[in-house]
A protein has these predicted regions:
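Alpha-helical elements of Rossmann-like donor-binding domains used by nucleotide-donor carbohydrate transfer enzymes
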Residues: 21, 38, 63, 147, ...
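Conserved FAD-binding catalytic core of PHBH/FMO-like flavoproteins
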Residues: 24, 48-176, 180, 185
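C-terminal helical "tail/cap" subdomain of flavin- and related membrane-associated enzymes
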Residues: 220-332
Length: 332
């Protein structure tokens, strides 16, 4: 069965093209770009000892953050679900697409979205139990991609699934690391931005956005009349509030996907899709009405008929419907 809901804004851009644009702009501004240069944390006090500022944007496995856990007061929480980042030339051009498939071992699902004219990202996620049962741990990267292609064949229109993780040893599948830092600044001259400072689960698609907004905020404060130490503190104070808000939403969405088998088995299609659309709690019932009033009205009508049996009557908001606890109906 297919359900569609509109009104949800989305922008996709290929990572390669994105980096090309950033490189071109940096050169335009006179920045010296160095590639294939190994970096060690000790370089901060040796090679870069005369630098006024070192910006550590070295990602979720940040060497800088990991070298000073007591300074950055960082925690990394490894979540249980397994996922693998794949690509395909099936474009999914009309919408951000979620696909749920039940295998002999249990449920597995995909997050798919287009990022250029002929390519889409295709993230496959599942529970650790299904991951183990399907034998992904013992597969090569290519075998994993082919197994996923077979599972989702009905949605790929003959296209293959591509892997870009040859640099990863062992399984291409990973667990999501939820990174939190209480402090982003060291010695008033080293600062974390992006995934080095915080991560947000891929299901809300805000990781790159957060990193860019960090950079914009940092540049704004450095370009002000503030000293570098004061500018770094202003940047951290400003960004931590917004990052925490999005991390909370991402955490809600992440935990929802960790319980997909429970929801998909217990809910009917409309109720399951409503639960998925509101999973982050950024999208409330009434916010969903603003985004897609037709879909929400159909869902309210569906629940009204299911719980009250008044086919054709005006839909009742879900909060006013009766609730059944085992065999005991609770009249609202």
């Amino acid at each position: 069965a297919v359900e569609r809901s509109g009104g949800h804004g989305f922008i996709g851009l290929g990572r390669k093209r994105f980096l090309q644009l950033l490189h071109a702009r940096a050169r335009e501004l006179g920045v010296n770009l160095h590639f294939e240069s190994e970096f060690d944390v000790s370089d901060i006090d040796t090679r870069f000892a005369d630098a006024d500022l070192v910006v550590a944007s070295d990602g979720l496995n940040s060497r800088v953050r990991n070298a000073f856990p007591d300074v950055f007061r960082s925690t990394t929480e490894i979540r249980p679900n397994k996922f693998v980042w794949l690509g395909t030339h099936q474009t999914f051009s009309d919408a951000f697409t979620f696909i749920f498939e039940k295998t002999s071992a249990g449920w597995i699902w995909a997050h798919a979205y287009q990022f250029d004219a002929n390519t889409s990202t295709f993230i496959v996620e599942t529970t650790p139990e299904v991951y183990d049962a399907l034998g992904f741990e013992h597969m090569s990267h290519e075998q994993s991609a082919e197994t996923c292609r077979q599972i989702f064949e009905a949605y790929l229109d003959g296209h293959s699934l591509m892997t870009n993780s040859a640099h990863i040893r062992g399984s291409a599948w990973i667990n999501f690391p939820a990174v939190y830092c209480d402090n982003w600044i060291k010695d008033d001259r080293v600062v974390l931005i992006g995934d080095a400072a915080h991560t947000a689960h891929f299901s809300i698609g805000s990781g790159t956005k957060l990193g860019l907004e960090d950079a914009i905020s940092l540049a704004k404060h450095l370009d002000s009349d503030l000293s570098i130490p004061a500018a770094l503190r202003a940047y951290q104070d400003e960004r931590k509030v917004e990052v925490l808000r999005l991390q909370n939403s991402a955490r809600n969405a992440m935990i929802w996907f960790e319980h997909v088998p429970r929801y998909i088995e217990a809910f009917d299609l409309k109720q399951f899709n409503y639960s998925m659309l509101t999973r982050s709690q950024r999208v409330s019932h009434e916010n969903l009405r603003l985004r897609d009033p037709e879909w929400l009205e159909s869902m309210e009508q569906h629940l009204t008929e299911r719980y009250l049996g008044n086919d054709g009557e005006r839909a009742v908001p879900p909060m006013f419907l009766p609730f059944k606890l085992r065999n005991m109906p609770l009249v609202n």
